[in-house]
Amino acid sequence: MPRANEIKKGMVLNYNGKLLLVKDIDIQSPTARGAATLYKMRFSDVRTGLKVEERFKGDDIVDTVTLTRRYVDFSYVDGNEYVFMDKEDYTPYTFTKDQIEEELLFMPEGGMPDMQVLTWDGQLLALELPQTVDLEIVETAPGIKGASASARNKPATLSTGLVIQVPEYLSPGEKIRIHIEERRYMGRAD
């Protein structure tokens, strides 16, 4: 069984009789000598959908669950439900808007390549996106003529409604690459 410091976002733990999907991990390194690094993890309870927070020391042993990953394409929206189709056997997977609220901020209209659904024992758990996505800037302060590629940033609203910090020289209409997990600008899209 893995230690807490080996757990990554998207894994599922069997903890206190609950199946918990890892949504976020904060690492807290104390400055005192001999103190252990703490891992504050935010989970979503697979069965109830409730949010759960737990803290672990780096050497705590945790029980992980092996998941089945299937590549899917976005199919259609039906009211409050988003339907994805398995690329191999065309099985439909349905999520409510609340279940994939975070992921929708990064999903351009029509979906994106390399999306996966996570299932365990036939139960649908989560939608997993690739590491990066290319999105268009729809609103930001105008680019400054002659602005250097300095560290000065400005907020930009993207085509999905997501707001991130981008360099000063970018303007509306440009496509940029975003690192999904860190919600940060990586560069202009190809």
Curated annotation (Swiss-Prot):
HAMAP family in the cross-refs: EFP
Species of provenance: Escherichia coli (strain K12)
Similarity annotation: Belongs to the elongation factor P family.
PANTHER family: ELONGATION FACTOR P, TRANSLATION ELONGATION FACTOR KOW-LIKE DOMAIN-CONTAINING PROTEIN
GO CC terms, sorted: cytoplasm; cytosol
Chain's gene name: yeiP
Molecular functions per Gene Ontology: translation elongation factor activity
Name of this protein: Elongation factor P-like protein
Lineage: Bacteria, Pseudomonadati, Pseudomonadota, Gammaproteobacteria, Enterobacterales
Entries under Pfam families matching the protein: EFP, EFP_N, Elong-fact-P_C
Gene Ontology annotations of biological process type: peptide biosynthetic process
